[in-house]
């Protein structure tokens, strides 16, 4: 059973489950994205899983071996303050309720799609990220909630997902925001960007990680997910080749204070719109300026196979 089975990541996982001989069911909101590669073998029930009664949720979970929570919201979705409440509503409370029901129904393994910000917060406690960023605190809290249901009878895995590339027809790609950022430099002979880098992988590789965890997780595991670790400079050159056919765009490292100054401007912009950002734009400078590189051991353990990241970025 996948909640979020018609989304970008859920449908990629569904296809791999089906290819491996598993039966897959999802509860999804209509309409299906037009032209999206949603496996025809997947059983789709239309509805909002957040609004299911206990009886309906129990009926959906009964007889299932595995449950995947590929739903919820990420830091790009805007909410008024306090933004943590929205994350609790969409990311934490449903995981709490669904995993409790999964346990009651004898589901053997559960997989929750989390964030690489959790990996970062745990790896660098000195950065105090949970205090600065409501979104990161919510993802750590989501992991804690998921962990309490894991035991010898039900394995629970949280995938700490980084940047993911690959698109689904009918949906806005993840990196539209990045393109909007880069358009600010159109008139300049160079692009200014922080000096750090990030972990990343393709949509198909996320699907493989989901299926791998659903087939093998024991007890509780938070998996740090990465297949490629790339500096922003290298990544942006790929984006420019894809976007404008520019072979070797000049990228200039932005000092942290410049990014922080831009963050102060963004704080004011959010305040004007009555939005609280889940990632504080001033504190983001610390994250963007570092090499947020995650070892690839966990993805290898989950059975992730190589893919063409450059083609996926396009």
Residue spans for each PLM region:
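Conserved beta-loop-beta element that borders a ligand/cofactor-binding pocket
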Residues: 145-170
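NAD(P)H-binding glycine-rich loop region in Rossmannoid oxidoreductase-like domains
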Residues: 42-93
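Conserved Rossmann-fold NAD(P)-dependent oxidoreductase catalytic core, especially the SDR/UDP-sugar
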Residues: 93-138
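A conserved pocket-lining segment of Rossmann-fold NAD(P)-dependent short-chain dehydrogenase/reductase
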Residues: 180-201
């Amino acid at each position: 059973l996948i909640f979020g089975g018609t989304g970008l990541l859920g449908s990629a996982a569904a296809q791999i489950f089906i290819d491996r001989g598993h039966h897959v069911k999802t509860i999804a909101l209509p309409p299906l994205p037009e032209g999206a590669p949603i496996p025809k073998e997947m059983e789709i029930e239309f509805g909002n899983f957040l609004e299911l009664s206990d009886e309906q949720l129990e009926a959906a979970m009964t007889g299932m071996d595995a449950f995947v929570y590929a739903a919820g919201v990420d830091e790009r979705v805007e909410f008024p303050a306090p933004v943590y409440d929205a994350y609790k509503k969409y990311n934490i409370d449903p995981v709490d309720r669904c995993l409790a029901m999964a346990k009651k129904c004898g589901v053997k393994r559960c997989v929750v799609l989390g964030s690489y910000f959790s990996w970062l917060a745990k790896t660098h406690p000195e950065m105090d990220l949970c205090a600065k960023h409501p979104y990161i605190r919510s993802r750590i809290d989501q992991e804690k909630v998921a962990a309490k249901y894991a035991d010898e009878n039900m394995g629970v895995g949280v995938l700490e997902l980084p940047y993911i590339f690959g698109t689904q027809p009918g949906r806005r790609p993840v990196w539209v925001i990045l393109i909007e950022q880069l358009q600010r430099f159109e008139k300049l002979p160079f692009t200014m960007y922080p000096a750090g880098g990030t972990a990343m992988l393709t949509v198909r590789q996320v699907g493989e990680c989901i299926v791998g965890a659903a087939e093998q997780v024991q007890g509780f595991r938070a998996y740090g997910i990465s297949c490629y670790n790339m500096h922003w400079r290298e990544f942006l050159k790929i984006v420019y080749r894809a976007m404008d056919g520019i072979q070797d765009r000049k990228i200039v490292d932005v000092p942290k204070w410049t990014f922080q100054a831009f963050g102060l401007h963004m704080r004011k912009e959010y305040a004007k719109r009555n939005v609280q950002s889940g990632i504080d734009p001033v504190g983001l400078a610390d994250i963007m300026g570092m090499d947020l590189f995650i070892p690839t051991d966990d993805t290898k353990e989950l059975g992730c196979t190589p893919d063409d990241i450059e083609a996926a970025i396009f």
